[in-house]
Amino acid sequence: MRHYEVVFIVHPDQSEQVPAMVERYQTLVTGQGGAVHRLEDWGRRQLAYPIQKLVKAHYVCMNIECGQATLDELEHSFRYNDAVLRHLVIKTKKAQTSPSIMMKSVEREEARKASTEASAPAQAQ
């Protein structure tokens, strides 16, 4: 089995359905003897260019280990799911389990928002 990094972009109106989609794709990979090594939900982010007149979308990254038949079925699922705007599959040499650079930036943004919200009530008094 080979290792792959899969990134897919979901329509922003379907953001609440992302956990169900991720669960379905994880089940597809693990059900056929594969493994999910890393799963990151990057959230709603700005697109580099408009896709279908949209400027924001929901990003998800998965690092998986699977066979070619499973990968073909996964890509087929992406292609015929209208909520998935774009997808990218890259073959990697080994399993990636550490947080990606994008996930680290998401965590930094969340920490910054939390510290701002914590200091806002203190300033109001």
Swiss-Prot record:
Q: Where is the composition biased (Basic and acidic residues)?
A: 105-115
Keyword Mitochondrion on this protein?
Answer: no
Q: GO terms for CC? A: cytosolic small ribosomal subunit
Q: Which UniProt keywords apply?
A: Ribonucleoprotein, Ribosomal protein, RNA-binding, rRNA-binding
Q: Where is the composition biased (Polar residues)?
A: 116-125
GO molecular function annotations of the record: small ribosomal subunit rRNA binding; structural constituent of ribosome
**Ranges for region Disordered:** 99-125
Give the record's GO biological process terms. translation
Keyword Ribosomal protein in the entry? The reply is: yes
Q: Which PANTHER family match?
A: MITOCHONDRIAL 28S RIBOSOMAL PROTEIN S6, SMALL RIBOSOMAL SUBUNIT PROTEIN BS6M
Query: Of which family is this protein a member?
Result: Belongs to the bacterial ribosomal protein bS6 family.
Q: What does this protein do?
A: Binds together with bS18 to 16S ribosomal RNA.
Q: What is the name attached to this protein's record?
A: Small ribosomal subunit protein bS6
- The UniProt gene name for this protein comes to rpsF
